Amino acid sequence: MDLQLKQWRSQQQQQHQTESEEQPSAAKIPKHVFDQIHSHTATSTALPLFTPEPTSSKLSSLSPDSSSRFPKMGSFFSWAQWQELELQALIYRYMLAGAAVPQELLLPIKKSLLHLSPSYFLHHPLQHLPHYQPAWYLGRAAMDPEPGRCRRTDGKKWRCSRDVFAGHKYCERHMHRGRNRSRKPVETPTTVNATATSMASSVAAAATTTTATTTSTFAFGGGGGSEEVVGQGGSFFFSGSSNSSSELLHLSQSCSEMKQESNNMNNKRPYESHIGFSNNRSDGGHILRPFFDDWPRSSLQEADNSSSPMSSATCLSISMPGNSSSDVSLKLSTGNEEGARSNNNGRDQQNMSWWSGGGSNHHHHNMGGPLAEALRSSSSSSPTSVLHQLGVSTQAFH
């Protein structure tokens, strides 16, 4: 094996010597010349960024022989690349000195960039730098192959087939796709209408409750707890289940209107205009019309004349034998009103309090009423005899 290797080596050396003798001119050419020729042919096609255009006077000194001044670097750069390197070095010196770069140094760079094809910038590794991009390059949005078509894809591979809306990049269907909005407009009701309807409903409800409570109170005297409502003309007692302040205010207004109507009806007949006398029956169901028809009306007129219009409260007292002062009094607040109105209101309040005496909270009203007015106004008749006659007449009805 060793002999065979030695023979093969000797044969190779002989062949190499014979080839070198046949080509003597190739051995005389220096090595750096081959490298320069090879690099010129390889880099001229790989870097077509700048073209040699020596138009200015400052670039006249740059020539192909300039590489001979730098024999070590001439083998690594072509003539065009060396010229561009000196141009960039000169621009860099202006920038370091803080002076303005002359326009004639920048014109060759602009011309070389404009003559290049657009496909070079789409795949250039330095396209993210703005100073390497031409003026017409506006990014990916300007590269729309179909500018008049809607750009919405809806998560698919193909685009929408409709045309874009005027001034937008989507069609009319996809223009509002990304917005968060409700499909139906929400109408907010105004507070004025809501308050007006609530007030109207509360007034209607208060009117119905007022009629119901007044009817039950006047006709049957009210069996539950009593409350006092102050109206415009005076006050009276009623029984009901509502305790809210808003209903009390509505009740007071409605009661004042009812009081005015009752005043007009009292001018014709004092005791038949009330709700309790409309059915002509008492709490036990007995007829009381003959008793009140026989009652003298002169005593009632004297009682109305005796009440003073300036008094703030009307007191009804019953004088018992042996007592000079009144033991039982009925308190009715009439307020400071005019003379004619206070007479009518006082008479209404006395009648109402007389009928409300059937409740559990007004035990001392049982001995009052129109009989007390008549007994107080007439001095000729005896209170005890009249009360005795009243008890006999009520027993006869029973």
Curated annotation (Swiss-Prot):
Cystine crosslinks: none
- Please report, in chain numbering, the residue ranges of the motif Bipartite nuclear localization signal: 149-159, 177-184
Question: Which stretches of sequence are listed as region Disordered?
Answer: 1-32, 299-398
Name all WRC domain ranges. 144-188
One GO BP on record is: negative regulation of cell population proliferation
Q: Name one Pfam family in it.
A: WRC
Start and end residues of each QLQ domain: 76-111
Low complexity compositional bias: what residue ranges? 1-17
Composition bias type Polar residues, residue spans: 299-350, 383-398
Q: Where in the cell is it found?
A: Nucleus
Instruction: Tell what triggers its expression.
Output: microRNA 396 (miR396a or miR396b) negatively regulates growth-regulating factors (GRF1-4 and GRF7-9). Up-regulated in response to cyst nematode infection.
Q: In which tissues is it expressed?
A: Strongly expressed in actively growing and developing tissues, such as roots, upper stems, and shoot tips containing the shoot apical meristem (SAM) and flower buds. Also expressed in mature flowers, but weakly expressed in mature stems and leaves.
GO cellular component annotations, sorted alphabetically?
nucleus
Coarsely, its chief localization is nucleus
* Keywords for the protein's UniProt record, in alphabetical order: Activator, Nucleus, Transcription, Transcription regulation
PROSITE patterns referenced in this protein's UniProt entry, alphabetically: QLQ, WRC
Q: What is known of its domains?
A: The QLQ domain and WRC domain may be involved in protein-protein interaction and DNA-binding, respectively.
The protein's job, in short, is: Transcription activator that plays a role in the regulation of cell expansion in leaf and cotyledons tissues. Component of a network formed by miR396, the GRFs and their interacting factors (GIFs) acting in the regulation of meristem function, at least partially through the control of cell proliferation. microRNA396-GRF1/GRF3 regulatory module acts as a developmental regulator in the reprogramming of root cells during cyst nematode infection, leading to the formation of the syncytium.
Family affiliation: Belongs to the GRF family.
Protein's name in the database: Growth-regulating factor 3
